Amino acid sequence: MIDIIDYNFNNHIKNDNSKFNNILKKYQINNNTFENGAILDLNDIGSNILYKNEDKEKDEEEYYYYKENQNIYNKIGNDLNYNFQYNEYIENNDFENNQPIDNFNVEGSGGGKQIISYYLSKNGNDTTGNGTINSPYLSICKIVNIINSYNGINIFKVFIEIGNYEAVEGCTLNIINNSVVSLIYFTKNEIINNNNNNNFNNNNNNNNNNNNNKNNYNNNKSNLIIPNIINLNINLKNSTFFLNYINLHYFNEKVINITYGINTFQFLIENSNLHCVNPKLPYCNILFNKLNQSLIINDDNEAMILIKNSNIIKFDFYFNIIEMNVENSNLYFTSLYSLISQNLTFSKSYFNNTLIYLVEYQAINVSIDHCKMIYDFSNNIQVFLMGTGNILTISNSQMESTGEFFSSYITCKNAKVQLMNVQFINWYLLRPFINLSLNSTLIMENVFARKMYIPAFIEIGNSELIIDTLEISGNKLVLIIIEGPSVISISYLTLKYQSEQGSPIMMNFPGGGFGMKTIINITSSNFINIDGFTLKDAQLTLFNVSMHSDSINSLFALSSSQLFSSKSTFSSSLIVGSYFLFSLDFTSLVDLDRCILTNSSSLFQANSFSNITITNSLIDSVFSRSVAIEIQGGSSFTMINSIINKTYVVSQSFIYSSSNSDIIIHKCNFLQFVMGLKPLGNFLNSNVFIDHLLLYQSFFQNQIFVATSSIMYISDTKLFNNSIYGSEMFLLNNQSYLLMNNSLIYGNSISVCFSSSHSLANIHNVTFQNNSGIFLYSVDSKISLSLLEFSKNPISSLYYLFYFTNSSATFQQLTIDSNYFMGSVIEAHFSEILFTNLIFSLNQNVDNLLKDRESPSLVFTHSNVKIINSTINSNSQWSLDLIWSQKSILIIKNSLFNSNSIPYNGYLIRLETCHLSLDHCLIFGTQSIEGTIGSFNSIINATNNLFLQNNALEMGGCFFLSNSQILSFSNNSFLNNTASIGAAIFTNGTLINNTLIIKSNKFLNNNAYEYGDNIGSYPTWISVEYPEDFDSTINYIRLYDNYSNLVADNFYTANIIIYDSRVNENISLTTFIRGGSGDFNYSFNVFSIYDFQISINIIADGFNINYLKYKSPPKCLNFQTSTLSDGCIFCPINQAATPEKGECTKCDTNKLVCLNNDVHTLQDYFMINNDVSKVYQCPFGLCSGQNNCNSNLFLLSSLQSPLCSRCLNDYNNENDDENQFKYNNNENSGSSGNSNNNENSNSNSDSNSNSNSNSNSNSNSNSNSNSNSNSNSNSNSNENNYNGGDDDDDEKNINNYKPSKSKNGLYCCNKFQPLLLIPFIFWILFFGLFLSLFKNVITGTMIGQIILFLQLNSIVFYPLPNIYGLQLFRMSIDYFDRYCLFKLDYIEKISISLISIFLIYLIGISDVTSRLILSILKRSLKLKKLIPLVIEKQLRKFEYYKMNRINTRLKSNWNIYLMLIQPLFHCLISLIVPKSIGSTTYLSIDLTILFISTPIQIVFFFSSIVILFLLEFRWWDLIFVFKTILFTSLSVTLLYNPPVYFSALVICQIVYSYSQFAFSPQRKDHMYRVENLLNLFQLSILIVINTSIIRNLSFNLIGILFTIVIFSCSLITIIYKLFFYKKLKTIKNHRLLNLIINVDDNKKKTNKNK
């Protein structure tokens, strides 16, 4: 029932909050009044409240409160009853004249309409009365009969006084023909005005002025205060029926029908009642346009029903009207059947068991405002049944029920419902409360539902639902059941389940078909104790939503659905079960933004390619015994800018993913995790992307992240103050891949940070600080680490920081700084390790006393290790070595070792059976006991390094080499290093070439406390110094190490045994070696007929040194001879002794200078093996005198490089020749030496028990002798340089070397440039194409003669250096001085030249150039103007040459042959001319090639001359061929005698030039003059080069000068011919085009000539 007090007493209560007003709001008029048989008295408001209070609640306090304020209640009743507009009608009526004025404007009522008024009163009389106000009628039927008797259009006004008027049976009021009937209440004794509306007062004696207005209707029911018309039948057709303050009652089993016609009518009820009590039929019916239950719709209908301030009781309305308005009325047990009504409006009314039925497919609008609707029956009746086109609007109303419904309260099919400010209370339904289907729309605003005992609140299918502010409570209630794809919008919903959970939204169909989805939007809502959402093919959007569930089911179970949530909160207190807060399947999606997940267990589960995204959210207080987040089946999980706090996972992982799923975590904080038996993240066959993650203050019993066959990308991550007990932080298994960069690992207590097995890891820019434990453990993996920083880690690991086995690792910019280690820093076994830009500084490594373990910092076994561009600085290694390598390859390049300390027994670098390559490194300030680099049974390559201020208390300040081998050791600098022995290098069982080491490295200010400032070893050999004269008997013993250092570290005893052939017995002596020296007294000064055997043995701790020498009379120095009287003496001036005979031989003063001990060669001469009988002249300027070459590129060795024929570059990067290279550089280019200064123990190596020491000293005998020659004069040398100097030894040594591959002509290459091959190839092609075009006339042209001129000079000046480009004319690839294309010997280069000549010949004899030019011109005739005249002439003759092919072919072949004969002869003759030096014969052109036999090419050459020459050619060609052979032969044979060579060339050139000038073999005059001019130039060049002016010039300047001169002569010749001899005729008409077009004519002419 409507709250009347709320709607009518606003003026009294809107500003009053007193208890009285609260009581008024609490007690409302309800249907109990009518259930007890009473009829409502609108005036008796106060009594009604008292009745309700006394009957139900018996509240004494409220009862007495009512009594005290009874006057106020009465005033309220008056306000209610007079709140009508009845006064408007009374004012406009003339009651005295019985002619009230009609105030109704009825269509058609004007003009001739008759207005008839009648009065009806209980004091009237039907017989005597006339119906006026003074004589009214008594019964209603009297009035009915009168009205029915009228015809036409009339206006009837019936004024009825208070009373009960019952119609007899058959009394029916007929209102037809557009008539108007008004039933109006009136009272005769009351003065009515606008200021007093008290026409209807309650039955209270407190107001005596209104007693006459009451009339008693005594049927023991109630009192009626307005007229009551009982059981009146009404027939309304095309007319108007109006009730004002009139009650219509139908009861006492009376069958009553109020029927209306088809067309226009008005049915107005105002301040009246329609009441049906106990009729015969279940309901009283008012039928509007009901004809056989069919609908008749008239477009002209303008019918209207107005019900205002009235009561409708137990009626059924069937109406087809335009508008129905019910205002401030009460409808009891009434059914409204709207057929085609457009607007139904109910306002401020009360509905009791009232039903509204609307017809489908009609635009019917139902509006209910400020109403109250109560239902108490239990049946299958639907209150609101909405069809297509219907619209229902309920606002500011209350719906309440006490019964139990079997159907929905509101049912919509393709209709629209609006609920605004509505309350639903105490509903019991077996079906959903509201049912929407077939594109219906439901809009709910400010709806409150309490005590709802229904299966579902809303059932929706294929419709739209909008909820704004809904508060609902109930148990096990489904808020929305979705039966088909729909659109749902919910805001400000409060759903709270008390004891049993219910589902907010449930889908009761398989899902959307044909791509249709259910759209759900929920904002600003609260769900408490719910069961969960189960969605399929739906899209759910949440904003500012709070949800809590204690259900064992998932809060969200999604299948092929999407969930978008923002600013929402989700929680579940359940900690057991296998259900997740969010469960996704079949490509579902969850997107959470700014959400909170709290007090939950399992959070997310995704399967079948589903996606979860969390952004800006908080996950707090998670406690789970199972997996919290499970991602499988190709699904993805993304978390961005979120926080996970206080998470406890007992027995499973927090995140588990598998089956090609993706995990993305971006800008998230994981705080205070506690993980049990499983890792935080367990990834199987997944892709993991983590960046900007903060993991803080968490505890793990197992790993943090485990990747198995997965890919992990981690960046910008911070791991702070976490504890991992006994396991790894990151574990990679089974082909996994990890990329981690820009991260910080700080303050963590871990066992292993990264563990990788059969996987790949790339760790970049990671800082590892203040942690404990192993950083990386790798097995069968490939690791790349860059920009890593490890600093300030106290006791990082008790074992190692990095561990690799069977792995590959790359370190780039690794920083290990200020750490304290009790184990190895990096260990690698059977692995490959690369360090680039390593910084290892300020670290300390001590013995691990807890584990009884000594550990080097860097440990490498069976591995390949490279350290490049690195710094190892200021470290303290208290446990063994800083770097320890075993059976590995260690490469260190461009690195710095600075101020490292090894206080105990250890090395900076220790090598055991390793290969070390050290290049461009600085090792500075190493403080150690044993040394800087200790090498044991290893191989050393060290180049371009600096060892500075390294200090070792024992042996080897920089290197300690034990049984090791040096492959290369050059360009190293050892400065200010100190050690007890060998301040730079110490060797034990290792023998290095001291001379080579000293020469190719720099040693400065190194200081050994005992001996070996530069290089030292243990004592290895003994030297005995015998007296130089025959009178002295004191012999000195020197004890040396391998490098001729006096062993001055101890006292040694030497046992001497001398066998003297003079007495034929052994003589024993003993002496002491102090400071490396000792002596014994014995005379060996005898003549050569006697000999001695000296044996010396020194035994000391750890070694045994023996010396055995068969001594003969002393040998003389180089160039000395021996006599019995004078001994060794120098020969007279201009004489010197030869090594072979030992006799004085006269020196050739043109070649040598012989002045006692000063014996040296002059310019352009070279001496072999200090033998004055073996002095040879060098090619032009090749030897500079003093037995030296003119360039430092040559090898100075009289045997290996005779006459400066070999280059140093022949041995660069050639391992086969390394020993030969060392041998060559040990030889001294000086001319004298000392033969008696030292004797060493080389000959006694077999008798020494220490085989290593003896073999080493034997193999380095040359260097030992050489190192002791410092005390002699500059002329001293050692006798072992030539080892006897006989020819057999020379030949043996010479036969061991290979041809030189680093020469450009006679000179050494400075650089190698393969790109020079490209211009050479272009030249060969160009020259071949040129000969192809001019092959028929080339020898008779100026260009041909110039080419021959350049070819000849390229051969003549072959010995000169700095010739550029000229060599191309003899087809040589050495056309750029001091540059070589490749490393090739002379035979290989000649082969290339011969192949090039052959290719030029093949191209030249073809017609390829002519055909190519003609082909181009045929395609573009415009190009013919660009063709030079000389080429055009050859093209014009092309057809003639083709027709005379036999004759021209032979001539052209001969011309090409003449153009190539000079380079061809030079190549062939250079291969057959020998040069003998000593007993060895070399190829004259290259002394590094041994001469074998005459090449077979020369046979083919002479055969070709015979075959190609025919009588028809001129005899002058034979002279040219002869001249070519002569010049070429002289250039090779006289190569080593330049003066004779150039003189012979001058004579030959004079004869040839004169013959050509005198006999004039050239038929063409202009060519005759050109040839004479070229001959003149050639003769002048040959004469000038042999002058003293040229020979006194700089050697390198001569070649450049003559290159310029030769090409200048060629240019002058061309200028002479073109401008000074004869002007070329201008050919105006180009006949080339005619030649191409008229080819057929030319062929005809040729045939005619034949």
UniProtKB/Swiss-Prot annotation:
Keyword Glycosyltransferase: no
GO cellular component, one term: membrane
InterPro entries, per the entry: Pectin_lyase_fold/virulence
Coiled-coil features, chain-numbered ranges: 194-225
Domain of life: Eukaryota
Protein name, as recorded: Transmembrane domain-containing protein DDB_G0287209
UniProt KW Coiled coil keyword: yes
Compartments (UniProt record): Membrane
Keywords: Coiled coil, Membrane, Transmembrane, Transmembrane helix
Membrane topology qualifier: Multi-pass membrane protein
Biased segments, Low complexity type: 1224-1284
Membrane spanning stretches: 1314-1334, 1347-1369, 1390-1410, 1454-1474, 1489-1509, 1515-1535, 1539-1559, 1570-1590, 1595-1615
Sequence segments annotated as region (Disordered): 197-216, 1218-1296
